[in-house]
Curated annotation (Swiss-Prot):
A GO term for molecular function: zinc ion binding
Name of the featured protein: Protein SprT-like
Pfam families registered for this protein in UniProt: SprT-like, Zn_ribbon_SprT
Main location: cytoplasm
Organism ancestry: Bacteria, Bacillati, Bacillota, Bacilli, Bacillales
Length: 152
């Protein structure tokens, strides 16, 4: 799906569910990571996450488009367009738009675990972040630390 197709799809969804035209731009933004889409208040454009289309297909994308169009049409009309506003929640129910999008399948990265051991007292430290062993010492005996293992 390219930029022209997504623009056409957003315009069709706007006319079908809201009976109002969408007069601005709809584009894919590859930098979006944790959200399905966003409505830009200043430009009135809608940005969508292409990975949601790849993972879940057009049906999920239409749901995200309906959600963003709720923000769009309420903001244009001067009504409450934020997630907590009553107007927004009512319009979501009316057009059967999702309040939240599905979680990304491969969203979570593998967590690395670093293990260090004191050379003096053999106390072991387990950390999620790597530490500078030249700068930091054991909190118990002030001995030097050595890395034991790094697991992911």
């Amino acid at each position: 799906m390219d930029e022209q197709e997504i623009q056409r799809l957003v315009e069709e969804v706007s006319l079908q569910y809201f009976e109002m035209p969408f007069l601005h731009k709809a584009v894919f933004n590859n930098r979006l990571r944790t959200t399905g889409g966003r409505y830009l208040l200043k430009s009135h454009n809608i940005e969508l996450n292409y990975r949601y289309y790849e993972l879940y297909g057009e049906e999920e994308l239409v749901g995200i488009i309906k959600h963003e169009l709720c923000h769009y049409h309420l903001h244009i009309a001067g009504r409450g367009y934020k997630h907590g506003d009553r107007d927004f929640r009512e319009l979501l129910k009316k057009v059967d738009a999702p309040r939240f999008c599905k979680r990304m399948i491969n969203e979570e990265k593998e967590k690395k675990i670093y293990k260090y051991e004191c050379m003096e007292c053999s106390l072991q430290y387990v950390r999620r972040r790597q530490i500078n062993i030249k700068r930091y010492v054991c909190g118990k005996c002030k001995g030097k630390l050595k890395p034991i293992s790094k697991t992911s």
